[in-house]
Amino acid sequence: MLSGWLRACALVMVGMVSASALAVDKPHTAIVVGGGLAGLTAAYELQSKGWQVTLLEAKPAVGGRSGLAGSEWIGNAKAQPLLNQYIDRFKIKAVPAPEFVRTPSYLIEGEYFTGADLATKQPATADAIKRYEAALDDMARSITDPNNPAANSTLFALDQITVSNWLDRLSLPPTARQLINQQIRTRYDEPSRLSLLYLAQQSRVNRDVDDRDRRAARLPGGSAVLAEEFVKQLKVIKTNSPVSAINQDKDGVTVKVGSVGYEAEYVVMAVPLRALSKIQMTPALDAQRLGAIKSTNYGWHDQIMLKFKTPVWDSKARMSGEIYSNTGLGMLWIEPALKGGANVVINLAGDNARIMQAFGDKQLVDQVLIRMQAFYPQARGAFTGYELRRSSIDPSSGGAYLAFGPGQISKYWRLWERPLQRVAFAGEHTDTLYPGTLEGALRSGQRAATQVQGLSEGKSYEPVKAPPPKAPEPVKESNGGIGGFFSNLFGGSKAEPKPAEKAPEVAPAPAPAPAPVTPPPAPVVEPAKPAVTEPAKKAPAKKEPAKKEPAKKEPAKKAAAKPAATHKAPAKTDAAKKAPAKPPADKAATPAASAPASDSKN
C-alpha cells in the first residue's frame, strides 16, 4: 500500500515537472502588422530570438514603399551601417557605383552641369549654393545631440520657423534658390512646409557623410531584393490581410482581419502613420498620438519612369545619376543606357507633386513629357512607355514619408518610440535619426523588436520627466559662424551695430568708459530684438535697481519666449517625448552593433 502511494506521488511529481517544462519551452507570441522593411525586420529579429511570429500585410505583396530606381543605389557602411549589415548577413551582392553617379549634378534650362561645370560657367550660382551649405552647416554644428535637437530655447525656436522663411533671409540669386528648393523638396518636402529645426537636425545627422557615401553601390533589384531575403526567413506571412481592429487586455492582444481574430501576447504596428487612423484600437490612442496622426507633415513624392528607345539628351553630356532641375522637371534620376535604351526616373516632390494630384496617370506623364519636349525635341518620338509610383495619393500612406513641419518636433518628437501597453510601433516615421529611409525603417524594426522583448521581461517604457530646454548659451557667440547665424536669423544683424553706436553715450563718463567694451556679450540677448535704448539701460538691469526696465524688455522677450511657453504647455507631452530617452537606450541594445543610416522607406 505504501509502495502504491509512493508510486502515485512520483507520477504527480513527474506530471508537475513536465507541465513546468512545457511552460518554459512555450515560445512567446507576437503579431507584426505591416510588411514593409520595418515590419519585416521586427518579425525577423523576434523570430531569431525564438518568438512565434505572424506577419499581416494588407497588400498582395510585402516590401512597403520602396522606390522605382533610387532604392537601387545604396550608401556605404558609413552612410548606412545597418543596411550594409543585413546585406552582408544575407550575402546579397551589391555592385560598386561608377564615379559619375556618386555626386549630384544640375539641369539648368535644359543644359546639363556637373558641380565643376557650375563653378566655372555659373560661378554666382555655385557660390550661392556654397553659402547656403555653410549657413546650414553652422546650424547643424549648434545641435550637439541629434536625438535631442531642441536642447535649448534658441534651437527650440528654430522649430517655429519654416525653411522657406530662412532661405528668404539668405537672399540667394534665383537659379541657386530654385536648385536648393529642388534638393530640399526631393529629400524632404516643400521648404515652406518644413521645420527649420528638422532640416538642421537632419544635416547634423549626415554632417560627416559625403554625397559620394550616399551612392556608393548599386543593389540590383533595389530594396525588394532585401525584402525577399527577409521573407525567406519568416515562417508565417499572411498577405491581403488588412487589419481593422486591435484589442488589448491584461492577458494579450487580439488583432482583427475581417471576421478572423489573431491572438498573441504582443503586437508591433509597422504601418505608415496615416494608416493608423484606419485601425480601431482598444484602449484607444491618446489625444497627443491622434493629433500626430492627423497633423504630422508627410513629404509628397511621385516617381515617373519614362522609357525611351535611345537617350534623347545631348550625347556629349554623360547624364547619369541624381540631377536637380531648376524647372518643373523636379529631380531626375537617369539610368545608364542599357542595350541602346534609356530610362529617366523623374521625382516630382513637394508642391510640384501636390498640384499634379488631380491628374490621372496618363495626364501626369503627358505633362512631364511636354516639359522634356521643350528641351529635347526628340523626346516624344523616342518615348516607349512609363511606370508610376504615386505615394502622394496613396490613401494608405498619405504621402511618401515623414517630414516634420514647423512646430511639430516640439509636439511629437520621439512620440512613437513609446509602446502603448502591449503594442510597440515601428516604421520610418518612428526613427529619430533616419526617417524616410531604408536605414530608418530597419532601425525602427530592430528597436520595436527589442522593446517587445523587454516588455515580455517586465521592462517599463513609461516616460520620465525631463528638464525644460536650457537657455541659449552665450559662449557660442564667440564662435563667429554660429553666433552670426543666430544673430541674423532672429533679426540681430542690426542689433550688433546698434550697441556699438550706443557705446559713445556711456563714454562721456570716465568710469563707465570700460563698460562699453564689455557689452559685446550683450548681443547674445539679440533674440529679444533690443530697443535702441537697451544698451544704455543694460547696466541698471544687471544691478536690479529699477524693475521698470526689465518690464520694458519683457514684451520683446515674450516674442522670443513664446516658443518656450508653447513648449511648456504640453508638459505631459514633453515628458512623453523625452521619455523614450530610455527606449532608445534599449534600442541601442540590439541596434547598438549597428549605427544608423539612410535610403528609402518602410
Model-assigned labels for residue ranges:
Residues 269-287:
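Flavin (primarily FAD) binding-site architecture
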Residues 144-242, 249-252, 261, 270, ...:
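Active-site/ligand-binding neighborhood in enzyme catalytic cores
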Residues 41, 252, 300, 316-496, ...:
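Conserved flavin/dinucleotide-binding core of flavoenzymes
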Residues 28, 257-266:
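Core beta-strand elements of the Rossmann-like FAD/NAD(P) dinucleotide-binding domain
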Residues 47-68:
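Glycine-rich FAD pyrophosphate-binding loop
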Residues 24-38:
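Beta1/beta-strand and adjacent pyrophosphate-binding region of the FAD-binding site
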Residues 69-138:
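Dinucleotide-binding Rossmann-like beta1-alpha1 core, especially the glycine-rich loop
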Residues 461-602:
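Compositionally biased, proline/threonine/alanine/serine-rich low-complexity intrinsically disordered stretches
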